[in-house]
Amino acid sequence: HTTVALIPHASMDRKTFLKHLGWAAVAPLALTACTPSRSTPASTSAPDTLGVHTLPEDFPPLDKSEEEWRRLLTKSEYQILFEAGTEPRRSSPLLDETRTGTYICAACRLPLFSSKTKYESGTGWPSFWAPLDGQVDTKKDTKLGYTRTEYHCARCGGHQGHIFEDGPDPTGLRYCNNGLALSFVPADASLPDLRT
């Protein structure tokens, strides 16, 4: 590891220096919390027996315009789902959700994860060891200068997060998800209709 000394510039006031010092301390956490600890993984799905709700058998792709999505979603949801943003660490109420149920795409409502695959990863984002079968697609992401595996809703293409190879058994994978990209449906409630 390289140590960097932060020395205030002669024209920099104390408040500005402390602000920059704070950002310098937080930046490594934000960059490493959702970074791979090993090579880029292949996607794995959870067995159908782990589903809590009955999944839709057929779901045609949902292709809405940017204007339509902006009207339906909050600014933060849109930024994460359709501009591949990342929410602040530990900001999602879903991080502490422990009830049995199904996590659905916040955009189109496609079921993506069973609560049975959710676990506490210590990263500050909701994490799962596998998605429901056939509900997410993946692609290569090199925006940070190295290769990661991005995953998104198979129906609307809404960005969910990235896959890393530091998860628990049985897959060894961690689906690091943005909480704003999901909605939770408890087991005793019906899944909402897919958005059209």
Where are these regions (language model features)?
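C-terminal segment of N-terminal export signals and the immediately downstream linker at the start
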Residues: 33-76
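Short cysteine-rich clusters marking metal-coordination/redox-active sites
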Residues: 105, 153-156
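Short, non-ligating residues that shape and space the ligands of small metal-coordination modules
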Residues: 114-115, 162-163, 185
